[in-house]
């Protein structure tokens, strides 16, 4: 798979595939963390401390608990489809997010990475609520229109998300709020929605983007907000 992404309007240059997927199969492929002494040295660098402050500020600007977002001095890699990639960030089901320090990472790129990972956190929370309710529950009713065939027909909104569609190995198109990685070896829906969030952050609300994916992104965020209020 060619590692590529489109350039971003806020100076977010062309990227390799840098998303670290959740799931035990890929977690075991993560490289060992940098030695402790090296990590401590990095954490004391003035540039690292400045980026850490910027990340905390960005998290607060997103309305997110900054204590759950950390800048890690570690470098992590993962193998996917026979290639090795470096991860920019990782989100966890408990709402925590790690961004991996890169001295070359601009503030714009840092914000885009955080926007992408935060959307995964929102998706996970709504997915958990969806899976916990009965088949005729309110979330099932709201999201019924986003059938597998309808989403598959749209494909992704970026080269990166389209690579997830190309890599899908399931016997049928992926289903919204399913455990895609376990079922088909990639996460087309989850990653496409996260790429919508990144595009909206990067280009603003007037960005031209697939209307069905934009609608689904907005619906997930509305339900995420409602779940938090509840």
Where are the model-predicted features located?
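Non-Sec secretion/translocation targeting segments of pathogen effectors
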Residues: 1-7, 11-19, 24, 28-32, ...
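Active-site-flanking segments in enzyme catalytic domains
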Residues: 33-43, 61-230
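Well-ordered, non-membrane alpha-helical segments in soluble/globular domains
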Residues: 47-52
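Active-site helix/loop module of the DD-peptidase/beta-lactamase fold
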Residues: 55
């Amino acid at each position: 798979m060619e590692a590529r992404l489109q350039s971003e309007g806020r100076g977010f240059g062309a990227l390799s595939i840098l998303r670290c997927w959740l799931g035990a199969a890929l977690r075991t492929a993560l490289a060992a963390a940098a030695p402790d002494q090296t990590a401590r040295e990095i954490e004391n660098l003035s540039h690292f401390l400045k980026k850490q402050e910027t990340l905390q500020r960005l998290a607060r600007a997103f309305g997110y608990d900054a204590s759950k977002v950390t800048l890690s001095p570690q470098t992590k890699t993962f193998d996917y489809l026979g290639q090795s990639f470096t991860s920019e960030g990782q989100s966890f089901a408990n709402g925590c997010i790690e961004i991996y320090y890169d001295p070359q990472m601009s503030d714009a790129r840092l914000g885009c990475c955080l926007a992408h990972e935060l959307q995964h956190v929102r998706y996970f929370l709504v997915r958990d609520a969806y899976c916990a309710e009965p088949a005729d529950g309110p979330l099932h009713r709201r999201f019924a229109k986003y059938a597998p065939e309808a989403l598959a027909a749209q494909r992704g909104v970026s080269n990166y998300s389209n690579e997830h569609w190309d890599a899908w190995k399931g016997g049928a198109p992926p289903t919204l709020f399913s455990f895609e990685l376990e079922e088909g070896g990639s996460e087309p829906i989850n990653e496409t929605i996260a790429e919508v969030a990144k595009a909206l952050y990067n280009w603003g609300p007037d960005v031209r983007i697939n209307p069905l994916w934009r609608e689904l992104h907005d619906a997930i965020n509305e339900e995420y907000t409602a779940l938090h209020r509840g």
